[in-house]
Amino acid sequence: MAVASVPITHGGDRMLSSVAALNGRIFDTDPVIAYMLLSMSQEERLAYLPTYWTALIKSALLNHAVITEADDWKAASVMIPPGGYIENAWTLLWAGFLGVLWRIGLAGIKVGESPTFSLRTLLTSLIIQRLWFEFSGMTDNAKRNGLRGHKQYYYIFSLGTEHEHRGKGIAKAIMRDHQQTAQAANLPIWLEATTEGSRALYLSMGFEEIEEIRLGKGKVAADASLQSGGPGVSLWAMVWWPNRTPDAIP
C-alpha cells in the first residue's frame, strides 16, 4: 500500500475507547510499558493494558490531544499540541489515574491475603517513582538538551500499528501528517521511541536522536524481566525540526 493512499481520520473523546483497545494490543510486548507495570504478572498486565491506556489517553485528551487513526484503525496515534503536557498533575487526577495506580499496587497482593495500607502504599509508590521520578526526570533532562530552549512543541504520546499490518507504511503516513502540521506551525516534534523498530522508522523520517535513556538499570533486563545488575530497558529521546522540511519528509 502506498503511503499516499492511506486514509486518515482525526478525532477526540469519541475515539478514546478504540485507541485504548488498539494500544493495548500494539504495546503488549513493549519493554517500557512492561517496566512501568512491573508489579503485575504478564497475564495481569495484558488484561489490564486497555484500562491503563484509557486513563493515560484521557489525561492526554484533557490536554487537548488529537487522536489520529489510519485505514480503519490499522494504526493510530495520540499527539499532544503545544502547551499541553501529559504530566499535568491535575488532569492526571481528573482522568482517574490514581485508580490505575491503586490497581497496579493491588496486583502484587495474593488471593486471600489481607491488603494492608502500608503494602498498598508501597506498591503504589513504586509505580509513581517509575513514572515521575525516573521516566519523567530522565526525559525532561533530554528535552532540555534536545529542544534547544524551545518551550512550544508537538508531543507524540503514542504511535503504533497492529502487528499484522506493520511494514506497510501506515504509521509512516500518520507521522508524515503530523510533520506537515508541525511544519505549518514552524514547531518541532518530540517523542520517545520505545523499540529499535520505531527508532529506525523515526530516524528514516528525519528525526534526530538526542539520547538513549535506560530505565531500571541494575534491576531489570532489556525485556523488563527482573535481573539483578541488568542493563535496563531502553528508550530513545528524539526530535524533528521543521527546518528540515519539505525535502526531509519522505
Regions found by a protein language model. Name each.
Residues M1-P7, D13-R14, N243-P250:
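Eukaryotic N-terminal low-complexity, Ser/Thr- and Lys/Arg-rich leader segments
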Residues A4-R25, T29, I33:
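A short beta-loop-alpha structural element at the N-terminal edge
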Residues E44-T68, K74-A75, Q129-F133, K151-Q152:
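A short helix-loop-beta-strand connector motif used in the catalytic cores of GNAT acetyltransferases and
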Residues A76-G160, G216-P231, R244-I249:
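Conserved acyl-donor/pantetheine-binding loop and adjacent beta-alpha core of acyl/acetyltransferases
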Residues Y153-Y154, T181-T194:
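Conserved GNAT acetyl-CoA-binding A-motif
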Residues T161, G167-Q180, S204:
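Conserved acetyl-CoA-binding loop-helix of GNAT-fold acetyltransferases
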Residues K172, A184-N186, T195-K219:
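Conserved active-site alpha-helix within GNAT-family acetyltransferase domains
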Residues G232-M238:
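Short hydrophobic/aromatic beta-strand or adjacent loop that forms the aromatic wall/cage
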